[in-house]
Amino acid sequence: MSTNFIYPNAHLIAGVDEVGRGPLVGAVVTAAVILAPNNPIEGLADSKKLSEKKRLLLAEEIKAKALCWSLGRAEPEEIDRLNILHATMLAMQRAVAGLNIQPDFVLVDGNRIPTLPMPAQAVIKGDSLVAEISAASILAKVARDQEMAELDVQYPEYGFAKHKGYPTKLHFEKLEQFGATPFHRKSFAPVKKILGL
């Protein structure tokens, strides 16, 4: 991890990250992780920079070694009702609330922080700078990819396992061909257009 980031002076620090703000389908998934200082995990990095195999291995190690971890989510209906930013903040609040040890301080990837009952700080590129945020990004990514694999079994014609719900050429073609599933985000412009909303 880079040394430019100065950790807050706190005993229990949770890292929080989200996956799935951009896709047209499925929940936005967040994770909160408090790492054990005496049980380091080698190879933590931004989940987007790791191979799927490495992510899966690290996710198991994080779950085994972290002091505690929790996932949060906001469903497509919530995203449509609140908008993606507010739904993401809600999912982050849920991840932090789900921790069975309350952190003293929360570090959140990006430039915005949700309202939390403890001090928090946003960290730009936090998934590359802060071990706790990297761990959260890995857990959230693995969980969301698993959900997309399950959705792919339910709706094999859409190719969800390939594009993970992101707005790719293939996804647009399948939307045109088959219409939207109940899991598509109806407030997102390409889906809205297909549904004629």
Swiss-Prot record:
GO cellular component: cytoplasm; ribonuclease H2 complex
A single MF term (Gene Ontology): RNA-DNA hybrid ribonuclease activity
Binding-site residues for a divalent metal cation, renumbered to this chain: 17-18, 109
Source superkingdom: Bacteria
Subcellular location: Cytoplasm
Catalyzed reactions: Endonucleolytic cleavage to 5'-phosphomonoester
Principal subcellular localization: cytoplasm
Matching InterPro entries: RNase_HII (IPR022898), RNase_HII/HIII (IPR001352), RNase_HII/HIII_dom (IPR024567), RNaseH-like_sf (IPR012337), RNaseH_sf (IPR036397)
Keyword Oxidoreductase appears in the UniProt entry: no
Pfam families referenced in this protein's UniProt entry, alphabetically: RNase_HII
UniProtKB keywords: Cytoplasm, Endonuclease, Hydrolase, Manganese, Metal-binding, Nuclease
Known role: Endonuclease that specifically degrades the RNA of RNA-DNA hybrids.
HAMAP family membership: RNase_HII_B
Protein family per UniProt: Belongs to the RNase HII family.
Designated name of the protein: Ribonuclease HII
